[in-house]
From Swiss-Prot:
Keywords annotated in UniProt: ATP-binding, Biotin biosynthesis, Cytoplasm, Ligase, Magnesium, Metal-binding, Nucleotide-binding
EC number per UniProt: 6.3.3.3
Species annotation: Bradyrhizobium diazoefficiens (strain JCM 10833 / BCRC 13528 / IAM 13628 / NBRC 14792 / USDA 110)
One Gene Ontology term, aspect cellular component: cytosol
Gene, per the UniProt record: bioD
Subunit structure: Homodimer.
Name of this chain's protein: ATP-dependent dethiobiotin synthetase BioD
GO molecular function annotation: ATP binding; dethiobiotin synthase activity; magnesium ion binding
Cofactor annotation: Mg(2+)
Binding site for ATP: 13-18, 101-104, 185-187, 192
Keyword Magnesium: yes
Pathway: Cofactor biosynthesis; biotin biosynthesis; biotin from 7,8-diaminononanoate: step 1/2
Lineage: Bacteria, Pseudomonadati, Pseudomonadota, Alphaproteobacteria, Hyphomicrobiales
GO biological process, one term: biotin biosynthetic process
Length: 211
């Protein structure tokens, strides 16, 4: 039985990491971000530990930790690092489920020749697409859905993040023919307790278990 889920987004800054923290907490899953670009501030795995309540042994180490906060291919070039995409194999998470977070959107380049979506196509894992609820998200979401379908990557569903926008959410799901998984509101302040409570109110765990 597959126990791995990929979390990707329509863009950078849509809330993938916060969603991943909530999902890992809800499922009792491990977390892995294959490539981390930017090390000066709180990195994504640290954010996951704080917001998801994960112990350090539930964080799978990154394969690449790049200093510069930029697209991985550019960050690697600046740091003098060569990303070998052949090493991006799936780790063993034991009996636990595994939440895998990409970087930015689907077309983010890892190298000059390899995009994140190329890796997702190779893995053939179910994908949760995170999207904004604001203006422009219909276009971004439908383009992302089309790209995933073209590669025959299974879309588990779409998770919206932001203020409620029923018309937009409905349009994306109906036109894109994808399942609405729920909507996570922006939380201020954003804490572990508030995120876990909001996640349980916004999503149904069984939607992420039958993979």
């Amino acid at each position: 039985m597959n126990k791995r889920i990929v979390v990707t987004g329509t863009d950078t800054g849509v809330g993938k990491t916060v969603f991943s923290a909530g999902l890992a907490g809800l499922l009792g899953a491990n977390y892995w971000k294959p490539v981390q670009a930017g090390l000066e501030q709180e990195i994504d795995s640290e954010c996951i530990r704080r917001l998801g309540g994960l112990s350090s042994d539930r964080i799978v180490p990154e394969l690449y930790r790049l200093r510069t906060p930029a697209s991985p291919h550019h960050s690697a070039e600046i740091d003098g690092v060569r990303i070998d995409t052949e090493t991006l194999g799936l780790p063993d998470s034991g009996e636990r489920r595994l939440v895998i977070e990409g970087a930015g959107g689907l077309m983010v380049p890892l190298t000059a020749r390899t995009l994140y979506i190329d890796i997702f196509e190779r893995w053939q894992l179910p994908v949760v697409l995170c999207a904004r609820t604001g203006l422009g998200t219909i276009n971004h979401s439908l383009l992302s859905i089309e790209a995933l379908r073209k590669r025959q990557i299974r879309i588990l569903g779409i998770a919206f993040i932001g203020e409620r926008n029923a018309e937009t959410e409905s349009a994306v799901c109906e036109i894109g023919r994808v399942r609405w998984l729920g909507r996570l509101p922006w939380l201020v302040p954003l804490t572990n307790d508030r995120l876990q409570a909001a996640f349980k109110d916004s999503f149904v765990s069984s939607d992420f278990l039958n993979l």
